[in-house]
Amino acid sequence: MANTTSAKKATRKIARRTAVNKSRRTQMRGSVRLVEAAILKGDRAAAVEAMKQAEPQLMRAAQRSIIHKNTASRKVSRLVAQIAKLAQ
């Protein structure tokens, strides 16, 4: 339990940031799931459209330290590779 005023304020700030980060992480995961679902269906057009939404969200999450930059890049790379396989 926080004793000082500044520690109490820090606790409130952390709670707010956690809520925001959880929301952003949930949105990011949802957009990635849409891409993965389109890939599983074999619908390349839908996968490309979903990827246009997912990539900026992944990179924004990395920029805001919700996920690591390399993790975001790896996810984007793997999804793009899977979409490219659909074209063959």
UniProtKB/Swiss-Prot annotation:
Presence of the UniProt keyword Ribonucleoprotein in the record: yes
SUPFAM superfamilies linked: Ribosomal protein S20
GO terms of biological process kind: translation
Gene3D superfamilies: Ribosomal protein S20 (1.20.58.110)
GO cellular component terms listed in the entry, alphabetical order: cytosol; small ribosomal subunit
Matches recorded under HAMAP family: Ribosomal_bS20 (MF_00500)
Protein keywords: Ribonucleoprotein, Ribosomal protein, RNA-binding, rRNA-binding
UniProt key word Ribosomal protein: yes
Originating organism: Afipia carboxidovorans (strain ATCC 49405 / DSM 1227 / KCTC 32145 / OM5)
Function statement: Binds directly to 16S ribosomal RNA.
Protein name: Small ribosomal subunit protein bS20
UniProt GO MF annotations: small ribosomal subunit rRNA binding; structural constituent of ribosome
Stretch forming the signal peptide: none
UniProt family annotation: Belongs to the bacterial ribosomal protein bS20 family.
Record NCBIfam families: S20
Domain of life: Bacteria
Any Pfam family the entry gives: Ribosomal_S20p
